Amino acid sequence: MGDAVKIGLRFRERIWERSDNLNMSFLFSQDDVVPTWFVGFPMRTPIITGWAAGPKSVQLLGKSEQEVAVAAVGALARVLGLESGFVMDRLEAVHYHDWHADPWSRGAYSFVHAGGIDIQRWLGKPVEETLYFAGEATEWTGNCGTVHGAIASGVRVGRAIAGPGRLG
């Protein structure tokens, strides 16, 4: 499993549209604790999601939601060129889940090491054609670590259970 931190921030207004970012989907800053930001463009909600994976996420693991919120607001303010106080004043809600500390996941996503594609096939192999496994970690067609991979593996298992030609 790879570590990742995902932080949802809801604001009173879409503060990222105050500059030339009106039609932005992603913002990226290599040097910050939360380097990646994305919105649900073309939907124009006042919600932005921060994403830190790998070594960047380690700086946030085990922190309280308040500590993560302060770090995230600071990172977002820097990437937008705004004052942290301005951003914090417009913040209405924060959602943060510590996937690393979650006893049911103990991480956030899978990734394949070089030469490791066979492990995904092994993880997705049914046991005596009665117990089937799905999930992005069992997806070997190039979409591991993604929602797309989770869905594709679910379709694969559904087809295997239903039998040939039953699910299209």
Regions inferred by a protein language model and the residue ranges of each:
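Rossmann-like dinucleotide/flavin-binding elements
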Residues: 9, 13-19
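Flavin (primarily FAD) cofactor-binding/catalytic cores of flavoenzymes
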Residues: 1-6, 11
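Conserved flavin/dinucleotide-binding core of flavoenzymes
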Residues: 3, 17-168
